[in-house]
Amino acid sequence: MLSAVARGYQGWFHPCARLSVRMSSTGIDRKGVLANRVAVVTGSTSGIGFAIARRLARDGAHVVISSRKQQNVDRAMAKLQGEGLSVAGIVCHVGKAEDREQLVAKALEHCGGVDFLVCSAGVNPLVGSTLGTSEQIWDKILSVNVKSPALLLSQLLPYMENRRGAVILVSSIAAYNPVVALGVYNVSKTALLGLTRTLALELAPKDIRVNCVVPGIIKTDFSKVFHGNESLWKNFKEHHQLQRIGESEDCAGIVSFLCSPDASYVNGENIAVAGYSTRL
């Protein structure tokens, strides 16, 4: 089944003029740009979520990280605190209301308000077709990937209003280019694009901007079906416009920008971080 997923990605890349210079993912030093701000990042103990949490903390924010497993929270906390970053952590299954309440309480322990919410948590428990997916799996994917960001935001909203804050949802390039055998996951990530635009409209009067980051193929545990296959991974890189596959840090910088004053006039956008254009 995993090979079906891999085949589904092969149609994404189109021949074009390639850049001869490898692009840097390290970004520019923006230390302090988010000083004295508070960020909550879900699904943030590994991969893209962890990179985002680290970047926000490096840029001055106090960051609350979360994961479903205590051992993952402890490991991520040790790494970030070892770098001298201001972080707190808590176990949170975003699909559970009581866990979301505890996450909110943890964030409020520090300063009584929250400036940024980054929803990076997501699941895909099944590799298979859309119509072959059980109702139970449908409910699980949509609950975690789509409902939980909105419900968590509703719980945080009283503490985010009028702070010139930002909400960042993390979708997937599968929202634009569906992947074979990731049926319901594709649907859930497409739904986030609409959720972003709707929330942006609703929350603008409260001085909260809402945008969405849409990662392409990023080297994480989620994509190990690709980078674990050396020949397939090499083929992807050779046919990619930038001749490389993304790193988690490639997504982190754009999230920090979207939280910063530099993005104060950016709202309701779905921004692809894929190394190629997804649309006109």
UniProtKB/Swiss-Prot annotation:
Transit sequence range: 1-23
UniProt cross-references to InterPro entries, sorted A to Z: NAD(P)-bd_dom_sf, Sc_DH/Rdtase_CS, SDR_fam
Tissue spec. comment: Widely expressed, with highest levels in liver and kidney, followed by heart, spleen, skeletal muscle and placenta. In hemopoietic cells, expressed in dendritic cells, but not in monocytes, macrophages, granulocytes, nor in B and T lymphocytes.
Keywords from the UniProt entry: Acetylation, Mitochondrion, NAD, Nucleus, Oxidoreductase, Phosphoprotein, Transit peptide
GO MF assignments: carbonyl reductase (NADPH) activity; oxidoreductase activity, acting on the CH-OH group of donors, NAD or NADP as acceptor
Entry-annotated residues carrying N6-acetyllysine: K96, K219
An example Gene Ontology CC term for this record: mitochondrion
Modification N6-succinyllysine, positions: K96, K219, K237
Active site residues according to the UniProt entry: Y185 (proton acceptor)
Protein origin, superkingdom: Eukaryota
Biological processes, Gene Ontology terms: C21-steroid hormone metabolic process; cellular response to oxidative stress; electron transport chain; myeloid dendritic cell differentiation; negative regulation of apoptotic process; negative regulation of cell population proliferation; response to toxic substance
Localization, UniProt: Mitochondrion matrix; Nucleus
Sites bearing Phosphoserine, chain numbering: S223
EC nos: 1.1.1.-
Disulfide bonds: none
Binding-site residues, substrate: S172
UniProt: NAD(+) binding residues: S46, I48, Y185, K189, T220
Induction: Up-regulated by IL4 and CSF2 in monocytes/macrophages. Down-regulated by bacterial lipopolysaccharides (LPS) and TNF in monocytice-derived dendritic cells. Up-regulated by MYB.
Database matches in Pfam families: adh_short_C2
Family (UniProt): Belongs to the short-chain dehydrogenases/reductases (SDR) family.
Record function comment: NADPH-dependent oxidoreductase which catalyzes the reduction of dicarbonyl compounds. Displays reductase activity in vitro with 3,4-hexanedione, 2,3-heptanedione and 1-phenyl-1,2-propanedione as substrates. May function as a dicarbonyl reductase in the enzymatic inactivation of reactive carbonyls involved in covalent modification of cellular components. Also displays a minor hydroxysteroid dehydrogenase activity toward bile acids such as ursodeoxycholic acid (UDCA) and isoursodeoxycholic acid (isoUDCA), which makes it unlikely to control hormone levels.
Summary of subunit composition and partner proteins: Directly interacts with MDM2; this interaction occurs in the nucleus and does not target DHRS2 to degradation.
Protein name per the record: Dehydrogenase/reductase SDR family member 2, mitochondrial
Organism, as annotated: Homo sapiens
